[in-house]
C-alpha cells in the first residue's frame, strides 16, 4: 500500500493538496490507530490524529452524530484542531432517519441543527447528511413535509443532502422536491447500489464513495474530472469509505491531488 509523505506540519500550516477551494474531500472518520504508518506517522499520538488529518485532507464526515449529538466541548476541540478552510459534515441522528423515518421530528431536527451551530459560526460547517435506511421506500409527501421544517428552511439553515438507499426514490418527483428546497441528492456508490448522477441543489453537491475495495488511480482521475465539472457552479463534498485500513483516506488524498491537476490543465 502506498504511504503518504511524512512531514510534521501543524494545523495552522496545512499541507492539503491545492484542490479548488470549493471542493472538500475526506473520509467518514479519523480516529483509527490502524492507519499508522501509511496515513498517520508512527509518532503522532491519537490526540493529534484530527490535527494531522487536516494537513492532508480538507473535510471529514462525522458519523458519531448518527447515534449521539456532540457536546459543546467536544465540538470545540474538533474545531480548534483544524484550519479555517476545513469543513465538517455531519450524519443526521438515527432518531430522525431510522426511528422517526422523517415524520414528526421537528424538535429532533432543531436539536441537531443547534448542536452543530458552533461549526457553522466558525465557518467550518459542510453539510448535514440524511441517510435513509434501505427499507425506506419513496414517500414524496413525507419528504415534502420534512423539507418544510423551519430549522431547514430559515435563511441561516445549513446545507443538506439526502442519501436514498432504495431505487424507488430515484424519480423526477424526488428531484423536483430537492431542487425546490435546495437539497442535494447524495450521489452514493456502494457495492450494491449506484445513485443517479443528478445534482439538485444550487449551492452544493454530495458524493459518498463507498466501495469496499477502494478505487484505482485511473478511477480517481475520472471522478476528479467529472466532479470538477459539477464544482463549476457549487461546492462539492466527497467522502470515501472509512475502514481499519487507510485505503479511503489515501484515496481522498489522491482525489484532491487529481482535482488540482485537472484545475491546472
Regions found by a protein language model. Give the residues of each.
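Residues lining hydrophobic/aromatic ligand-binding pockets adjacent to catalytic sites
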Residues: 1-265
Amino acid at each position: 500500500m502506498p504511504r503518504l509523505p511524512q512531514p510534521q506540519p501543524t494545523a495552522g500550516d496545512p499541507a492539503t493538496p491545492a484542490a479548488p477551494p470549493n471542493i472538500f474531500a475526506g473520509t467518514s472518520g479519523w480516529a483509527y490507530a490502524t492507519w499508522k504508518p501509511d496515513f498517520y506517522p508512527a509518532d503522532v499520538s491519537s490526540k493529534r490524529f484530527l490535527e494531522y488529518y487536516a494537513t492532508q485532507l480538507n473535510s471529514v464526515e462525522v458519523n458519531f452524530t448518527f447515534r449521539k449529538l456532540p457536546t459543546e466541548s467536544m465540538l470545540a476541540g474538533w474545531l480548534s484542531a483544524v484550519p479555517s478552510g476545513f469543513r465538517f459534515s455531519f450524519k443526521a441522528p438515527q432518531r430522525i432517519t431510522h426511528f422517526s423515518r422523517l415524520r414528526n421530528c421537528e424538535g429532533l431536527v432543531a436539536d441537531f441543527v443547534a448542536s452543530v451551530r458552533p461549526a457553522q459560526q466558525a465557518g467550518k460547517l459542510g453539510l448535514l447528511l440524511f441517510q435513509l435506511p434501505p427499507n425506506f421506500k419513496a414517500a414524496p409527501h413525507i419528504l415534502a413535509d420534512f423539507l418544510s421544517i423551519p430549522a431547514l428552511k430559515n435563511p441561516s439553515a445549513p446545507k443538506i443532502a439526502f442519501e436514498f438507499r432504495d431505487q424507488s426514490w430515484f424519480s423526477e418527483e424526488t428531484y423536483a422536491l430537492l431542487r425546490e428546497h435546495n437539497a442535494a441528492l447524495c450521489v452514493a456508490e456502494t457495492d450494491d447500489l449506484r445513485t443517479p448522477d443528478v445534482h439538485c441543489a444550487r449551492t452544493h453537491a454530495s458524493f459518498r464513495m463507498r466501495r469496499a475495495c477502494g478505487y484505482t488511480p485511473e478511477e480517481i482521475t475520472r471522478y476528479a474530472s467529472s466532479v470538477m465539472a459539477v464544482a463549476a457552479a457549487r461546492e462539492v463534498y466527497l467522502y470515501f469509505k472509512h475502514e481499519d485500513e487507510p485505503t479511503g483516506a489515501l484515496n481522498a488524498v489522491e482525489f484532491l491531488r487529481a482535482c488540482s491537476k485537472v484545475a491546472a490543465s
